Amino acid sequence: MTNITKRSLVAAGVLAALMAGNVALAADVPAGVTLAEKQTLVRNNGSEVQSLDPHKIEGVPESNISRDLFEGLLVSDLDGHPAPGVAESWDNKDAKVWTFHLRKDAKWSDGTPVTAQDFVYSWQRSVDPNTASPYASYLQYGHIAGIDEILEGKKPITDLGVKAIDDHTLEVTLSEPVPYFYKLLVHPSTSPVPKAAIEKFGEKWTQPGNIVTNGAYTLKDWVVNERIVLERSPTYWNNAKTVINQVTYLPIASEVTDVNRYRSGEID
């Protein structure tokens, strides 16, 4: 079996997992439905997260929170299908050159616009050996131009086939046609990350007060081994359809404890 065939099979498995793990951040409330006055949610997340950096996470607990804090070009809809995220539309030429058109109202939580250059920086950072991302090889599934040589140390990260045509247009060039490429972009590691915050705070950029997000929520509080609290982001482009105002994640590994706290009303 060739390496390409093996990689295609792995990519198919990755896609299935990604589509199954969708997270709904917004909702259309039916006419006549009155929402509860207090819109909060408390969830058991299974364990303490190792990081909130999209390029450092690899477990389900981390991914659950990352999808609330950061939004990539695409997201998964309620049925697990890829849907527009920061990219409101996209097109391709022979499934090899992909162009993503970003929303002009997409913003970071500090009010600055989310741009195509943010994605260029993020994707280059994800494959940078200095980042040591567990998903550094993820973009190989999409056969992005230059990725193999970059991971082998033969080319610089600036040779990755991703380019900002302008603030709201991102062009991605692949080494071969990949019809399913857009589906890969719901993965947390392809989300944009805030360059200014990372350069200012270094490894502490994900701490409350330092972190800048572009998803439906921002980080309000993080008490290790106790709770992570997220609150609704007023700068999120689809904030008008965000229903839950606050989400609290609890790191409860014991199923017995989880059930008992659910029965007592401590977990939703």
Segments (PLM) and residue ranges:
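Cleaved targeting-peptide boundary
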Residues: 26-34
